[in-house]
Structure formats: C-alpha cells, structure tokens
UniProtKB/Swiss-Prot annotation:
Gene Ontology biological process terms, A to Z: negative regulation of MAPK cascade; protein dephosphorylation
PROSITE patterns linked to this entry: TYR_PHOSPHATASE_1, TYR_PHOSPHATASE_2, TYR_PHOSPHATASE_DUAL
A GO term for molecular function: protein serine/threonine phosphatase activity
Source species: Tetraodon nigroviridis
Residues that hold substrate according to the record: 139-146
Cell location: Cytoplasm; Nucleus
Protein name, UniProt field: Dual specificity phosphatase 29
Residues annotated as domain Tyrosine-protein phosphatase: 46-195
Predominant cellular place of this UniProt entry's protein: cytoplasm
Alphabetic keyword roster: Cytoplasm, Hydrolase, Nucleus, Protein phosphatase
Family according to the record: Belongs to the protein-tyrosine phosphatase family. Non-receptor class dual specificity subfamily.
Amino acid sequence: MSSGVKSKSRNPYTAVRVDPDSDYVTPGTLDLEQLFWTGPEVQYTHVNLVWPGIYIGDEKTALELPGLRDLGITHVLNAAEGKWNNVLTGAGYYSDANICYYGVEADDKPTFNISQFFQPAAQFIHEALSQPHNNVLVHCVMGRSRSATLVLAYLMMRHSLSVVDAVEQVRQRRCILPNHGFLKQLRALDITLQEERLRQKREAPGQEKHT
C-alpha cells in the first residue's frame, strides 16, 4: 500500500479515468466538493457512527471520558494534537480509562500536507478494529475536516472504496466538510490507488497487458 500521495502533474480540477475499462472517473476537486452539498442534509451532532467500529466526533466528545465509556471506545485518534487551536489531550489523558491513543499534529489549513498521516492513521484504525469488540473515535476540534479526512483515507486504503463512495458513506451519517486542500489530497490518493489496482490487474496471471 502506498504510504503517501504521489505528486501529480494532472490538473486537480479535471476528472481522470485511470482504468480505460472501468466506468469510474475520479472527479475534479470542485465536483468532489459538490458532493457535500447534495442529497439529504445531516444535522451536526457531537459524535456519529460512520462505519462499523468507527466514530467521528468533536473536542467535547474526546474530553468526556464517561461518554467514551458509554460508546465502548477503546481507541482514540486525535487529528488535532497540539496546543494551538487543537485538542490538548494525549496518551496520559486516557490512561486510566484504558484507551489506546494516537495523535497527529495536523492544521486545518488547505496548504497543510495531511496526506503524510494517511498511512499511519489508517494503520492505527486497522489494528484497532482487528479485534471485533473495539471501537475507535477519530476526532479533531469540530469533527468535520481533519478527522473526516483521515477516516475517508482509511476507507479508501483499507476497504478499497473510491473517494466518491467513501464521501457518500460518511456524509450520510455525519455532517463533514474537509477543506479544499484536503479534498485535493484525497483526490490524489484516489488516483494513486486506482493506478495501483490497474497495475495489479495487468500483472495478474492470464491478464493481457495493455501497452
């Protein structure tokens, strides 16, 4: 699995069809952004279950240990670790609650390279959910941009969802809105994953290699 997003020379605002035999097209960034403004509106709440075993929540959710216990949370991924406009918790905050903690210092800015955390965050979630009774809270300050971006990347990398399917899966269950720069990075990840799958398909025994 790719550990990050490769640099792309493609225009991020145009659609890309990686596999000529597939109907799927990676949308341009603006079209991807429109997915968050179409369909039924989901009211904002502090925390939502968006995938089996995965909750996305906000700072309030992350700080309330009794509430985490009620949800059965065993792992916390803080996508807003740090002191400045972030959620200041850490592993020690959850030690008495027997909750495993992982934090990343991500800024909710379009220029921030959040893709550097795609692989380690996905690995943390994957390992947490390897035990059937575990539940993961992925949070930032509002639970809309940084945390949502990492969950979307996890679904794409570990469950082979396209960026479109991942967005639809999560936005139907929580009010999310990754910033424009994060969407560009998710789009680049989508293209990278599509290219990897196309390469694997062409290298599979009995498959004709296209030139």
